Amino acid sequence: MHVEAFLREVQEIARNIDGATVERMAAELASVRDRGGRLFLLGVGGSAGNCSHAVNDFRKLCGIETYSPIDNVSELTARTNDEGWDTVFSGWLEVSRLNKNDALLIFSVGGGDAARNVSINLIRAIELAKARGARVLGIVGRSTGYTALNGDVVVVIPEVNPGRVTPLSEG
C-alpha cells in the first residue's frame, strides 16, 4: 500500500512539474559550461548527499567543472568549528573565487528561511553569489523559501503530500 501511494505521488509530481523551468535550468547549466564557468553544488542533510553524487554526473556526463564543499570534510568541519555553520559555504566560495562566470546549484527541501533561522548557510552563499554576479539555480521542495524567492532559475518540486515533502523533493 505504501509503495503504491508513493509511486502515485511521484507520477503526480512528474505530471505537474514546471517543464519550462526545467528547460531554463538546462540552458543555464549549458551556458555555465560554454562560458568556462564552474558549478558549485550546495545542500545539507540528504541534499548534501545528492550534491556529492551530482558532482560526478555534471563533470562526467555534462562536461561542467563542478565542485561541492561537502566533499572536503576536513575543510567543512574546520570552517564550521572556527567560523560557524552560518558562513561555512560562503567562506568556501570566497576562497574558491566565485565569480560572474560561475553558478550555484542549491539542493534543498525548504531552501532557507532567515526568519526561522533555517539553512542560513545557504542564504549567505546565495547573497555572496548575487553580490559577485554568479547565477543562482535551485531544486527545492518549497516555493516559500529563500532559494525559491531569490534564485535566478529554481525548480520547485510540486507538493503532493505534505508528510513526504523531504523524500519526494530529495528523490
For the regions a protein language model found, what residue spans apply to each?
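Generic N-terminal amphipathic, Lys/Arg-enriched alpha-helix
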Residues: M1-I17
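A short, well-structured juxtamembrane/interface segment
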Residues: I17-R35
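Surface-exposed amphipathic alpha-helices with a cationic face
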Residues: R59, R124-R132
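Short beta-strand/turn micro-motifs composed of small residues
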Residues: I70, S108, G138-G141
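Glycine/threonine-rich flexible loop motifs
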Residues: G112-L122
